[in-house]
């Protein structure tokens, strides 16, 4: 196990040394994400003073109002990842189609990302974050992004909260790095994170319960209440999942009568978070199958999401159809 205090770049290089045939490309790719995260963190911290709060006056491909900080974060991610030359193509939640990199025309990897998850909470200073998912390149077109989640080679998120934390998996466990602004580095603060086998917190927007399409889910939530569970729901997936990862329990965003396929995006949110949770010892499901087994049909596909501790997800599956 890596020692606390190790900086993220050194950690990435140490992991690379465990694989003698590694080219170093994935290491450079992750370092590019780290650089972008530092800049986004700086913008988030100064948002109230730099006129980047509020809406940008546009609607994205998801049909959502684009926040100014959304747009800025997307630009930062695109600039750093394209400039790195380590990605053949990039898919952003904010863009209709993937962006193909001239510098990365021979690159081995593709990346899907949500530049700023939870952006509707920006104006009220709630924790928000960046989510990313990396796959091996398997072709020249859209098929690169239509791979099952279990084929990810790396996934992670950066949460911008009371501190900035970079949570990463490369398929060998999960580690968390806290940003130290005094030295300008992410330092290992949470080595080998394991989600508790069982928690006492559930995270779901019960205000939508009257719209849920599965009565079993209502019974399941009632069962958790009977067992003394606490409800905690922020409305920022990064923040809610981060708490679930550390404390255990269940995070859910089900389908409802308005969003019959769910609301969260498979590529940019569901699959990377499910991969992280699995690497930490947890489970995920759409209610019908493991999220990591879903083969995307579209880069903006949505799915119902339930992720968390094994105990809670196993119990959930006993209730829902």
Swiss-Prot record:
UniProt cofactor note: Binds 2 magnesium ions per subunit.
One GO BP annotation of this record: sucrose biosynthetic process
Pathway membership: Carbohydrate biosynthesis; gluconeogenesis
Classification via Gene3D superfamilies: 3.40.190.80, Fructose-1,6-Bisphosphatase, subunit A, domain 1
Reactions mediated catalytically: beta-D-fructose 1,6-bisphosphate + H2O = beta-D-fructose 6-phosphate + phosphate
Top-level class of the enzyme under EC nomenclature: hydrolase
Binding annotation for Mg(2+) 1: 93, 114, 116
Residues that hold Mg(2+) 2 according to the record: 114, 117, 269
Sorted UniProt keywords: Carbohydrate metabolism, Cytoplasm, Hydrolase, Magnesium, Metal-binding
Homology family: Belongs to the FBPase class 1 family.
Listed name of the protein: Fructose-1,6-bisphosphatase class 1
Gene from which the chain derives: fbp
């Amino acid at each position: 196990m890596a020692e606390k205090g190790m900086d993220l770049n050194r950690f990435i290089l140490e992991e690379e040394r465990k694989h003698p045939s590694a080219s170093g490309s994935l290491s450079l790719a992750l370092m590019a994400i780290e650089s972008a995260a530092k800049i986004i963190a700086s913008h988030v911290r100064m948002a109230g003073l730099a006129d980047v709060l509020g809406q940008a006056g546009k609607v994205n491909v998801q049909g959502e109002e684009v926040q100014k900080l959304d747009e800025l974060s997307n630009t930062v991610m695109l600039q750093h990842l394209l400039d790195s030359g380590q990605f053949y193509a990039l898919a952003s939640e904010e863009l209709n189609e993937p962006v193909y990199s001239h510098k990365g025309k021979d690159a081995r990897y593709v990346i899907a990302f949500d530049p700023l998850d939870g952006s509707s909470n920006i104006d009220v200073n709630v924790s928000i974050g960046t989510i990313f998912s990396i796959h091996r390149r398997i072709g020249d077109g859209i098929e690169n992004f239509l791979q099952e989640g279990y084929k990810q080679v790396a996934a992670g998120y950066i949460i911008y909260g009371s501190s900035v934390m970079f949570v990463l998996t490369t398929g060998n466990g999960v580690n968390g790095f806290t940003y130290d602004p005094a030295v300008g580095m992410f330092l290992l603060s949470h080595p080998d994170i394991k989600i508790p086998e069982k928690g006492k917190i559930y995270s779901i927007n019960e205000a939508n319960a009257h719209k849920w399409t599965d009565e079993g889910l209502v019974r399941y939530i009632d069962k958790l209440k009977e067992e003394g569970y606490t409800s905690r729901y922020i409305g920022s997936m990064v923040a809610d999942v981060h708490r679930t990862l550390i404390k255990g329990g269940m995070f859910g965003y089900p389908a409802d009568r308005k969003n019959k396929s769910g609301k969260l995006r498979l590529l940019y949110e569901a699959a990377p978070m499910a991969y992280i949770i699995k690497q930490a010892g947890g489970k995920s499901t759409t209610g019908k199958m493991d999220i990591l087994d879903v083969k995307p049909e579209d880069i903006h596909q949505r799915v119902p999401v339930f992720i968390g501790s094994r105990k809670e997800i196993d119990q959930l599956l006993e209730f829902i159809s």
